[in-house]
Amino acid sequence: MAAKDVRFSEDARHRMMHGVNVLADAVRVTLGPRGRNVVLEKSFGAPTITKDGVSVAKEIELKDRFENMGAQMVKEVASQTSDVAGDGTTTATVLAQSILREGMKAVAAGMNPMDLKRGVDKAVVAAVEELKKLSKPCEDSKAIGQVGTISANAEESVGKIIAEAMDKVGKEGVITVEEGSGLDNELEVVEGMQFDRGYLSPYFITDQQSMAADLDDPYILIHDKKISNIRDLLPVLESVAKAGKPLLVISEDVEGEALATLVVNTIRGIVKVCAVKAPGFGDRRKAMLEDIAVLTGGTVISEEVGLSLDKVTLDDLGRAKKITVNKENTTIVDGAGSADDIKARVEQVRIQIEEATSDYDKEKLQERVAKLAGGVAVIKVGAATEMEMKEKKARVEDALHATRAAVEEGVVPGGGVALIRALLGIKDLKGANHDQDVGINIARRAMEEPLRQIVNNSGEEASVIVNQIKGGEGNYGYNAATGEFGDMIAMGILDPTKVSRTALQNAASVAGLMITTEAMIAEAPKDEEASPGGAPGMGGGMGGMGGMGDMGMM
């Protein structure tokens, strides 16, 4: 086991604080509409220029292991806030640095770190309650657009396109962000249910121009196993041919003579058929087949529920107004399932979302809800260069995340004003002892810090503006972009409540842990192990040889 370097109390905290300051000072300059740029070196190609706090934080690794531990803990605050709320990374970093800086001073003055932490935690709980009171629901597309614009560093086109996407697919619909091929951002909306499986044979194509199979008012056979024997399919094919409608076959696979017969029937015009593989894998496939069955009013033909292919009637098949199948995707528009059944299925999936523990599972379940509820929107990000594309795509994803947070928990006035107003909640707050009171004051001071930083970045005098805003009430604040005072919400400067809340809670949590740190352990640096003088390793070897000679002499 490698040797360890151990540092205690003041020395440990001092080193950790130095690391925090390096990271936080690099991140805080990006805060606000007049935030400065940070240039990041890349191992190949041109450097990246960004105003995104979390991108700056991710780049920072310090040489000193103890300082690096401090930096990594604050980096965790930023990424945690970004994961939960989509924005607020820089705010969280500024808050954590302020709580930690003031907390370290208090600990150095002989105060009890545990009581300081209790005081800070008490203040944060009260401030969060006040934030919730300030919060207003974010329902109209104008407010949604404003939140998106601010999160995307004041880029109006991003806010606009996110608001438009939410209008099209609903607030809970799936909105994905992809790299586009043009210079401008584009919005593409897929109505109905779409899954990523295309036709099994190009002979199913009905429209040569679009290379797709279009089925109008078709029947849909949903089966969970492979189909290779045509005898199983014949009764269904005959019934569908008599009804004079097309047929879509969704199953694990269709192969051999079964596929050949379907192709021949289609080419001869006896019955128009298209076959696709079932979407997903394993349990997810079962669930998605059930979703399709509910959406189209059909039944999943499965031996598990005692149904076999040769016993299928037209009543077991689903229906839809139109189905389009291309090489990669199948889109079912206007399924014939009953609205009540679809609603019940959506509720069922929502319960699973609440119980899901992994982000991946949650994302997949949300996609299922959106497909059942009717639509997926794709924002295609346009840019002139690949470097700009990556930066822009990250900003659009953040803005989308923040907008969802705003819809979920509402909005508060932006520009650091919400945290100033939340100070009302801790105005008369008292701790159990003097040290806890100091902790409450540390939180109070930290909550002013984001506003101070926004003002500093815009080149104005922070203390004057902070005092002026404290003298106002409600949404009254300072617009750093224009240098005007006024109603922040009327000026379109909003923050999602979830962003302000998460930033404050995460910052206090990590800063509290760091204040109460009494020892730090890291691997000892390798270069200290080499003995001094001569080439590394030579001295030790030679000494050993000398010793051997002495022993021989005796």
Swiss-Prot record:
Pfam families: Cpn60_TCP1 (PF00118). It is an enzyme of class 5 (isomerase). It comes from Nitrosococcus oceani (strain ATCC 19707 / BCRC 17464 / JCM 30415 / NCIMB 11848 / C-107). InterPro entries: Chaperonin_Cpn60_CS (IPR018370), Cpn60/GroEL (IPR001844), Cpn60/GroEL/TCP-1 (IPR002423), GroEL-like_apical_dom_sf (IPR027409), GROEL-like_equatorial_sf (IPR027413), TCP-1-like_intermed_sf (IPR027410). The lineage of its organism: Bacteria, Pseudomonadati, Pseudomonadota, Gammaproteobacteria, Chromatiales. GO terms for cellular component: cytoplasm. NCBIfam families: GroEL, PRK00013.1, PRK12849.1, PRK12850.1, PRK12851.1. It is found in: Cytoplasm. This is Chaperonin GroEL. Gene3D superfamilies: GroEL (3.50.7.10), GroEL-like equatorial domain (1.10.560.10), TCP-1-like chaperonin intermediate domain (3.30.260.10). Forms a cylinder of 14 subunits composed of two heptameric rings stacked back-to-back. Interacts with the co-chaperonin GroES. One of its GO terms (biological process) is protein refolding. It catalyses: ATP + H2O + a folded polypeptide = ADP + phosphate + an unfolded polypeptide. PANTHER family: 60 KDA HEAT SHOCK PROTEIN, MITOCHONDRIAL (PTHR45633). The gene is groEL.
